[in-house]
């Protein structure tokens, strides 16, 4: 249930009855402080100004029309015209019951959309590195959230699987008599890539052969296509191991590489010319965009075909957006690509809109993100200054978590310890990233992310096991609790219940904005509220069985919400720690 949406509609109707225009915004928000109630309507100031009246006067008139019977126990005006809404304990109790009776914890299903999510996008013949982490896990959290809400989500792994480097790689593999690329590890390919590049730069005969191979590959020659497929297969097989370790939902079926759009490129260039959007300029084909200016203040030229006939990333991105609308029937397209690509995407999309390939009614959203930095505030590197491989980072996370878990659980069986270390280590790396606003850079710090205090994966995983332990001590199962009523009398019970019922609102924000840190903040706050509730409202030693069972049900919904919330982030939970 979305209480914010329910209250927004109630307040809006009351505002209209009080003389506000039909398009008025009630601006109902969750209250920042307990003394201001559970929700606050802040829209009176803006509307009162339009009506030429005092905000408090409008708020008083709104209250005469506002019917929150059975929802709120108290409604009051604060300050210049804020309306504070205190939820009725009986309303909270009823909806806690309903949430517990639902597999979805009472979360409603919005109108279903087809949403394409572009994320991860590693390059073929290169191992994934830390630069791929943010796109991969933030994008996957968005996908999990959207799917839970009931949308049809199409994962699009825009793999870099095309370009001149493939002629170079195939030529070098051939030279080394290692055409049977299927038996090679990706680590070998990285070495081959370096060696191939070195030969390409130093040996003109080799470079010429590589260029010829590119032409043959692009013309569809069977032998070269087969070699190219092998390179792609090895890369994606290795990447799948990383995805599985990260508990990310991407599979080989989700690969939609750059090569997919190659057949579309000549037609797009011809169409843009025919529509008068693209012109010849110094031998290249260019689209001039009034929205973007060059240093001289003139419309910026975006090249879509080079003088030699080659295409650019922009051309591919135009084709990509067109394909996602026309072929995949997207209602919405989300791109999890770092902030440095923003202008490039905006230019490609400006051309897409002008050409009529994707209507304005279909949002193209760049959910950009900042960089992962080391403690020195510079891009995260190895001690030698090299790029950190993602597999190496996950290995270190596992090793550090293994030591941490073994220290706290010296008698734990080896297999259980390994499972726990994996959940904690991988969870720590992911949660440290997901808990930060994606638009900002963040400092990668092992000590902070593996701490059992603060907004970290280990703390959240421990909070979940702590709630479960209450049930183990109670020696009661879910079926026995089902018939028991929920009764809310204490303030801490009400605060916990209200926060539990804000789960859907949190999911809605994450789905709309692509900001998993909002879910992390919600779960951390929920864990803190449960801690206060547990301390001040005895559960197992409650004054009677009715109160005991009611509090057990609040604990039960807390556990289910923590688990489901962490699952939308791709963070594994464990039963014991």
UniProtKB/Swiss-Prot annotation:
Monomer. It comes from Shigella boydii serotype 4 (strain Sb227). GO terms for molecular function: arginine-tRNA ligase activity; ATP binding. InterPro entries: aa-tRNA-synth_I_CS, Arg-tRNA-ligase, Arg-tRNA-synth_N, Arg-tRNA-synth_N_sf, ArgRS_core, DALR_anticod-bd, Rossmann-like_a/b/a_fold, tRNAsynth_Ia_anticodon-bd. The lineage of its organism: Bacteria, Pseudomonadati, Pseudomonadota, Gammaproteobacteria, Enterobacterales. Transmembrane segments: none annotated. It is found in: Cytoplasm. Its EC number is 6.1.1.19. GO terms for cellular component: cytoplasm. Its main location: cytoplasm. Belongs to the class-I aminoacyl-tRNA synthetase family. Keywords: Aminoacyl-tRNA synthetase, ATP-binding, Cytoplasm, Ligase, Nucleotide-binding, Protein biosynthesis. One of its GO terms (biological process) is arginyl-tRNA aminoacylation. The keyword ATP-binding applies. PROSITE patterns: AA_TRNA_LIGASE_I. It holds the Pfam family Arg_tRNA_synt_N. It catalyses: tRNA(Arg) + L-arginine + ATP = L-arginyl-tRNA(Arg) + AMP + diphosphate. A motif ('HIGH' region) lies at residues 122-132. This is Arginine--tRNA ligase. The keyword Cytoplasm applies.
């Amino acid at each position: 249930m979305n209480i914010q949406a329910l209250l927004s509609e109630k307040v809006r109707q009351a505002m209209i009855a009080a003389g506000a225009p039909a398009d008025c915004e009630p601006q109902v928000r969750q209250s920042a402080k307990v003394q201001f109630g559970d929700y606050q309507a802040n829209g009176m100031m803006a509307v009162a100004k339009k009506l030429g009246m005092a905000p408090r006067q409008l708020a008083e008139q709104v209250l005469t029309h506002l019917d929150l019977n059975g929802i709120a126990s108290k409604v009051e005006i604060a300050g210049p015209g804020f309306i504070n809404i205190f939820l009725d304990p009986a309303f909270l109790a009823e909806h806690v019951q309903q949430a517990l009776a639902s597999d979805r914890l009472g979360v409603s299903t919005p109108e279903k959309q087809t949403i394409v999510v572009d994320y991860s996008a590693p390059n073929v013949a290169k191992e994934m590195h830390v630069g791929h982490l943010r796109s991969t896990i933030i994008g996957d959290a968005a996908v999990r959230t959207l799917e839970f809400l009931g949308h049809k989500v199409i994962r699009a792994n825009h793999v870099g699987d095309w370009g001149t480097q493939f002629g170079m790689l195939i030529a070098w593999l051939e030279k080394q008599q290692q055409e049977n690329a299927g038996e090679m590890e990706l680590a070998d390919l990285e070495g081959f890539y370096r060696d191939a590049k070195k030969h390409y730069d130093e040996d003109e005969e080799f470079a010429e052969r590589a260029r010829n191979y590119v032409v043959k590959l692009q013309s569809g020659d069977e032998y070269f296509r087969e070699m190219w497929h092998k390179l792609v297969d090895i890369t994606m097989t290795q990447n799948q191991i990383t995805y599985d370790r990260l508990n990310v939902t991407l599979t080989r079926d989700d690969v939609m590489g750059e090569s997919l759009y190659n057949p579309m490129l000549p037609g797009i260039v011809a169409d843009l010319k025919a529509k008068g959007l693209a012109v010849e300029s110094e031998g290249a084909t260019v689209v001039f965009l009034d929205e973007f200016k060059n240093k001289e203040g003139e419309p910026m030229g975006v090249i879509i075909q080079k003088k030699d006939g080659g295409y650019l990333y922009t051309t591919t991105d135009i084709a990509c957006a067109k394909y996602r609308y026309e072929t995949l029937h997207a209602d919405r397209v989300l791109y999890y690509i770092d902030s440095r690509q923003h202008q490039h995407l905006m230019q490609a999309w400006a051309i897409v809109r002008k050409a009529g390939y994707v209507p304005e009614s279909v949002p193209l959203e760049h959910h950009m993100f900042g960089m992962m930095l080391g403690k020195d505030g510079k891009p995260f590197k190895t001690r030698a200054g090299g790029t950190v491989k993602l597999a190496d980072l996950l290995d270190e996370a596992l090793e550090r978590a293994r030591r941490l878990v073994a220290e706290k659980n010296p008698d734990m069986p080896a297999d259980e310890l390994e499972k726990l270390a994996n959940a904690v280590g991988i969870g720590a790396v992911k949660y440290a990233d997901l808990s930060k606003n994606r638009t900002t850079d963040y400092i990668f710090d092992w000590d902070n992310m593996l701490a059992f205090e603060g907004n970290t994966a280990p703390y959240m995983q421990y909070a979940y096991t702590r709630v479960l332990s209450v049930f183990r001590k109670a020696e009661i199962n879910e079926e026995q609790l089902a018939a028991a009523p929920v009764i809310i009398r204490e303030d801490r019970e009400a605060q916990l219940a209200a926060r539990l019922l804000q789960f859907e609102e949190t999911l809605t924000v994450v789905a709309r904005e692509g900001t998993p840190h909002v879910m992390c903040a919600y779960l951390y706050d929920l864990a803190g509220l449960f801690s206060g509730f547990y301390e001040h409202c005895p559960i197992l030693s409650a004054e009677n069985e009715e109160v005991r069972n009611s509090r057990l049900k609040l604990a039960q919904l807390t556990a289910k919400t923590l688990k489901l919330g962490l699952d939308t982030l791709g963070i594994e939970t464990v039963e014991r720690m």
